[in-house]
């Protein structure tokens, strides 16, 4: 069978790598793909890049090539309604409809949904007037969190530790319109403390299948300093998610979300990612929903998945996820992101990457912002690669990842040296 995967990031390289391992699969087409999927030789099935991004063109390709299943990686095509287009063309696709994807594409929709269905989350208020937002911040004080309502590629959240920072964030979004439509409304919410974890599940409309837990590192610099990024590294499993917290997350967050979407007449199918804040006494609050797998969490999660992903996704599309169990590698997987010069601001592109090691049983390199140019792999985006190490402990996995990184070189390469530190006591 043939599979179509939408996207071009590290998450998509990891998904393509896993999908191509299925004995059922002949070709995985990645649209548009990256330098890693362009040079993927490590799997039994072929992985091919497809230079198409238009939704109808992708649907036409899927029809013409008799694609068995389409899997959507990033949020933008979901918010644009790719699932609706494919379903209207009678095609099998895994992901939420445009309406259901509002759980991620509108923070206001998501918060109102949680409030309506009793899902634990931070107190909040939504504003489109800068004047009213400033008054609210003055009344509430800092620290406080300012979020753009719409999709802002991971750059729409400001955790303001001071009033000045909070007011500046409101001005940036509402007054100066720096994020365009995404920042035309802002959600302002209370600051939560605790440990964050990423809880990612497959949903078939009614049934849920949990993937391995993970924890990521959002800040650019060691010791969680510097600006927020899309994520500088992640590891799986997340020790903070104990069996009790796992059960609680399913009971208090995931199942009420799936049932709530059904009750609201917009049943949810697809990956569902709940960003959770776990307080020291084990209480959970939902920070955000994403309608996709996290990046870089996908890379260590896929590195640990032993089961056939195609089989699980087929069951999800058919509404029979209750018949599936997943098997996981007992080892810890830890991924470290290598970023381009000047990231998270406008990154430099075109730097030649050398020394990429061959994948082994315990070291895997997933590409993100790379492309193939004149036979060489060069940087083409902010987060360039994610290097994953596997070992029996977090420390061991960390050592494997950094050992592999020691061979890789490109001008301006930046990465954190402490990924996983929270789990290494």
Residue ranges and their predicted role:
Residues 1-98:
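ATP-binding N-terminal substructure of ATP-dependent carboxylate-amine bond-forming enzymes
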Residues 21-23, 38-39, 94, 116-118, ...:
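Solvent-exposed alpha-helices and their adjacent loops that cap or buttress functional pockets
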Residues 165-168, 344-347, 392-399:
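Short, conserved charged micro-motifs
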Residues 4-5, 103-185, 215, 239-255:
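Active-site nucleotide/adenylate-binding loops and adjacent lid/helix of ATP-dependent enzymes
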Residues 370-374, 379-425:
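Generic C-terminus detector
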Residues 160-298:
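Internal nucleotide-binding/catalytic subdomain
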Residues 250-272, 290-362, 372-373:
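Active-site "cap" helix and flanking loop/linker of ATP-utilizing ligase/carboxylase catalytic domains
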């Amino acid at each position: 069978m043939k599979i179509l995967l939408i996207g071009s990031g590290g998450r998509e390289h990891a998904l393509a790598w896993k999908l191509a391992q299925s004995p059922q699969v002949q070709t995985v087409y990645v649209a548009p793909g990256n330098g890693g999927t362009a040079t993927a030789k490590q799997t039994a099935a072929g992985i091919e890049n497809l230079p198409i991004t238009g939704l109808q063109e992708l649907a036409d390709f899927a029809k013409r090539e008799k694609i068995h299943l389409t899997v959507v990686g990033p949020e933008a095509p979901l918010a644009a309604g790719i699932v609706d287009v494919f379903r209207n063309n009678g095609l099998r696709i895994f992901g939420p409809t445009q309406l259901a994807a509002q759980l991620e594409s509108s923070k206001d929709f998501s918060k109102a949904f949680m409030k309506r269905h009793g899902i634990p989350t931070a107190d909040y208020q939504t504003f489109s007037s800068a004047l009213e937002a400033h008054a609210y911040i003055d009344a509430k004080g800092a620290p406080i969190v300012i979020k753009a309502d719409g999709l802002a590629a991971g750059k729409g959240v400001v955790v303001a530790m001071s009033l000045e920072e909070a007011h500046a964030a409101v001005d940036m979004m509402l007054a100066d319109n720096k994020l365009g439509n995404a920042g035309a409304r802002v959600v302002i919410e209370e600051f939560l403390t605790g440990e964050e974890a990423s809880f990612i599940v497959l949903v078939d409309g009614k049934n849920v299948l949990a993937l391995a837990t993970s924890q990521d590192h959002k800040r650019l610099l060691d010791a969680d300093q510097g600006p927020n990024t899309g994520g500088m590294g992640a590891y799986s499993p997340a020790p903070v998610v104990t069996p009790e917290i796992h059960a609680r997350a399913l009971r208090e967050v995931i199942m009420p979300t799936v049932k709530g979407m059904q009750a609201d007449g917009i049943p949810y199918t697809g990956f569902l990612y709940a960003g959770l804040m776990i307080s020291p006494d084990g209480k959970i609050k939902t920070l955000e929903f994403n309608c996709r797998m996290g990046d870089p969490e996908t890379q260590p999660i896929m590195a640990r998945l032993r089961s056939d992903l195609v089989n699980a996704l087929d069951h999800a599309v058919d509404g029979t996820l209750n018949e599936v169990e997943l098997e996981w590698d007992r080892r810890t997987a830890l991924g470290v992101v290598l970023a381009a010069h000047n990231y998270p601001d406008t990154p430099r592109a075109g730097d030649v990457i050398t020394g990429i090691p061959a994948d082994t049983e315990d070291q895997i390199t997933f590409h993100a912002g790379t492309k193939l140019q004149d036979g060489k792999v060069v940087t083409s985006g902010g987060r360039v690669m994610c290097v994953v190490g596997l070992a029996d402990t977090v420390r061991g996995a960390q050592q494997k990842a950094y050992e592999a990184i020691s061979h890789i070189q490109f001008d301006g390469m930046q990465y954190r040296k402490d990924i996983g530190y929270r789990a290494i006591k």
